[in-house]
Curated annotation (Swiss-Prot):
Residues 1-20 are annotated as: Disordered. The keyword Oxidoreductase does not apply. This is Copper transporter 2. Induction: By copper deficiency. Down-regulated by treatment with high concentrations of copper. It is a multi-pass membrane protein. It comes from the Eukaryota. Belongs to the copper transporter (Ctr) (TC 1.A.56) family. SLC31A subfamily.
């Protein structure tokens, strides 16, 4: 392979990180492992900052985002089937899109690698599932009541 034509090309420019080894005072270091502490950035630059109150608010917001995402995931709007109504389809699409967006926001918050954010995200999803997805607070439908009265199947397809 002929590489003679490459001698006219300028050398690659050094990256900004190799040009200086110092960081500016307003930039925070991004963690690549889990860490404990309130001094973090979650979702937005400078939020929650270094304030304990703002960190607590951040944890509450992440918890609520996870609970709402679970509520939307188990919403009756998403379970409507057999309808060919376009309005119902648009409503399902809107709810699904909102749920997916909230889930991605929670995922991005967890990517801050702050252990507190991780714990409240998992707790939010767990509480959301317990309240809206588990059978704890659901009334069984008529089909479920009938199925509970029948003896368990033996697995035989005779």
């Amino acid at each position: 392979m002929d590489h003679d034509h490459m001698h006219d090309m300028p050398p690659p420019s050094p990256s900004s990180s190799s040009m200086s080894n110092h960081t500016t005072p307003h930039m925070m270091m991004m963690h690549m492992t889990f860490f404990w502490g309130k001094n973090t950035e979650v979702l937005f630059s400078g939020w929650p900052g270094t304030s304990s109150g703002m960190y607590a608010l951040c944890l509450i917001v992440i918890f609520l985002l996870a609970v709402i995402a679970e509520w939307l995931a188990h919403s009756p709007i998403l379970r409507v089937s057999g309808s060919t109504n376009r309005a119902a389809g648009l409503a399902q699409t809107a709810v699904y899109t909102l749920k997916t967006g909230l889930s991605y926001l929670v995922m991005l918050a967890v990517m801050s690698f702050n252990a507190g954010v991780f714990i409240v995200a998992i707790a939010g999803y767990g509480v959301g599932f317990f309240l809206f997805g588990s059978t704890t607070f659901k009334k069984p439908s008529d089909d479920q009541k009938t199925a509970e009265l029948l003896p368990p199947s033996s697995g035989c397809v005779c």
